[in-house]
Design a protein with these regions (language model features):
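Active-site-proximal beta-alpha core segment in soluble small-molecule metabolic enzymes
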Residues: 36-170
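Active-site loop/helix belt of alpha/beta enzymes
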Residues: 128-234
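Generic N-terminal amphipathic, Lys/Arg-enriched alpha-helix
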Residues: 1-10
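Acidic, metal/ion-coordinating pockets
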Residues: 16, 20, 107, 185
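CE4/NodB-like, metal-dependent polysaccharide N-deacetylase domain
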Residues: 20-28, 119, 187-199
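Residues at alpha-helix termini
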Residues: 29, 52, 71, 197-198
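N-terminal glycine-rich anion-binding loops that anchor highly charged ligand groups
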Residues: 14-44
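Residues at or immediately flanking beta-strands
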Residues: 32-34, 121, 203
Length: 234
């Protein structure tokens, strides 16, 4: 093969093996596997996931959600705090596609509750150490405010809590990755237990490639969302 311009070259076999290994780990731990289509923003690579039974995906933007919805995906989470300026874009999605948005403040909830007309799933973003966005896990008074606000909008359905331990990428060893992962799990499990009586079907969505690759402990989690494990482009 002669390459005369910048070209993405993949070893398809290795990528598919990586996908199968992560899918098998999710099955082994009875977890929903909702991979983050972050690096592999490709409808074709998306079909590799479908071959191992993946039906739900994660993306980082409304535009990518639209791209994959047009490619046939029917259950998509946009896993960053939602930009309220994009409400009109959400209304353009077909009701055939289940959409989940992520929030971390009441202003966002009130805005989407008023401006978004379609049925929409809502995850509350929790900070478990990365400190980039989200509500601190122990601030249940703030979480309660969001839940009360959410309850005012019948077309918005609270799904659960979502976190991303992005600081595992700065870890210097597997041991440090494990420590970060376990700390995050404990914090999310605390919330799951705290709200169990109010929301018995509460989802706990976690997922970064380092933790999901190394760990065999997913206590309390219901869903994993690793992304760049497909290429391991760390």
């Amino acid at each position: 093969m002669e390459i005369i311009r910048p070209t993405l070259v993949l070893n398809k076999t290795i990528c598919q093996q990586n996908i199968e290994l992560m899918a098998e780990k999710a099955r082994r731990h009875n977890l929903t596997f909702r991979p983050h289509f972050k690096t592999h923003q490709s409808a074709e690579i998306g079909t590799w996931f479908q071959k191992v039974g993946v039906e739900k995906i994660t993306v980082s933007s409304v535009s990518m959600a639209k791209y994959f919805a047009e490619a046939g995906w029917k259950d998509i989470t946009i896993a960053i705090p939602f930009n309220i300026l994009e409400c009109s874009e959400i209304n353009r999605f077909s009701e055939d596609c289940a959409l989940n948005l992520v929030v971390d403040n009441t202003l966002t909830i009130n805005t989407i509750g008023t401006k978004i007309k379609r049925n929409t799933g809502i995850y509350i973003k929790i900070s478990t150490g990365y400190e980039r966005s989200g509500i601190e896990y122990a601030a249940v008074h703030k979480i309660d405010e969001l839940l009360i606000t959410l309850s005012q909008y019948k077309h918005l359905t609270f799904k659960g809590f979502l976190t991303h331990s992005g600081h595992t990428y700065r870890a210097a060893s597997k041991y440090e990755v494990q420590n970060i992962h376990y700390d995050s799990l404990k914090k999310m499990f605390y919330l799951k237990e705290y709200y169990a009586s109010q929301f018995p079907k509460l989802e706990i969505s976690i997922g970064d490639t380092p933790s999901c690759s190394i760990s065999e402990n997913f206590m309390g989690a219901t869903e994993i969302r690793p992304g760049n494990f497909v290429f391991y482009d760390l």
